[in-house]
Amino acid sequence: MKTLTDEKLTIVGAAGMIGSNMAQTAIMMGLTSNICLYDPYAPGLEGVAEELFHCGFEGVNITFTSDIKDALTGAKYIVNSGGAARKAGMTREDLLKGNAAIAEEFGKNVKAYCPDVKHIVVIFNPADITGLITLLYSGLKPSQVTTLAALDSTRLRSELAKHFGVSMDVVENCRTYGGHGEQMAVYASTAKVDGKPLAGMIGTDALTKEQWAEIQTKVTKGGANIIALRGRSSFQSPSYVSIEMIAAAMGGKPFRWPAGAYVSNGKFDHIMMAWETSITKDGVALKEIKGTPEEEAALEKSYKHLCALRDEVIAMGVLPPISEWHALNQNIK
């Protein structure tokens, strides 16, 4: 089987539903011939490895370990789903304290065991914060760390397709920016449905303002809805989309959706947030975001919410004050 690379890809949290699905997706997409599975829960990890062995895949070497040093040593790409899962009634922010500590330890381990890693995708929630913590403690460049932020945009696409009764293929350029959660900024001005600008349909019989507001609510509550329907948090969609991200970083197909990236541009500073980006072998690069005044105001509101979360982490002592970030990671200006 031809693969994008032969370099080592480590899946952190591989015993979980997201991690195990990421591993299978990476193999089926032909990312690399060298996949390492890591999880501190050794029995579950071995079970995942056995299932993958039983798939009979060809051209791939699958290893597994519960030793983080072994898992990260030599890794050039990492996707990390190794945080606590969100349960019914919890918001992403409820997870903040425990997962912030996990992200700090992970970042330090990256710096110790694989400082030459090329790209990391962090997907455990709240990803805007866990990705930021990982970046700071890993010592990596901002271009080398991204977070999963695309599911809100894919959910917008899905809801619009359902509303208009059309294939998702004709719903284009759906975008949400800012926070990966209930405080996201949902953009209408970028989207088209069957070639028609979405913004021009809002307030008409085709899509009343009330219906548009309902769609936005469904998008912002999409993750909670999956929990209500399935009794557990999403795993198929985050697995697939996060592997699409790391594939782009390996030189594969361009990533089609917004990604969480470190932003510090004078208007939005010292934060990880969903942004319009490109992901290539050179890492993640920021693009310009254009929206209506209302959309830009929503993005600023989302940014302030993320800043409050960031400042809470600083108050917890997980991160130092912003003025000391450069001393922690010299790639942060």
What spans do the regions from the language model cover?
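Rossmann-like NAD(P)(H) cofactor-binding subdomain of soluble oxidoreductases
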Residues: T91-E159
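Hydrophobic Val/Ile/Leu positions in short beta-strands of Rossmann-like dinucleotide-binding domains
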Residues: I11-V12, L37
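Conserved N-terminal Rossmann-fold NAD(P) cofactor-binding segment
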Residues: D6, L31-A75, A84, D311-V318
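Conserved S-adenosyl-L-methionine
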Residues: M28-N34, G139-P142
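Conserved glycine-rich cofactor-binding loop
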Residues: A15
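C-terminal substrate-binding/catalytic lobe of Rossmann-fold NAD(P)-dependent dehydrogenases
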Residues: S138-S143, S153-K333
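Rossmann-like NAD(P)-binding element
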Residues: C55-H119
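N-terminal Rossmann-fold NAD(P) dinucleotide-binding loop
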Residues: G19-S20
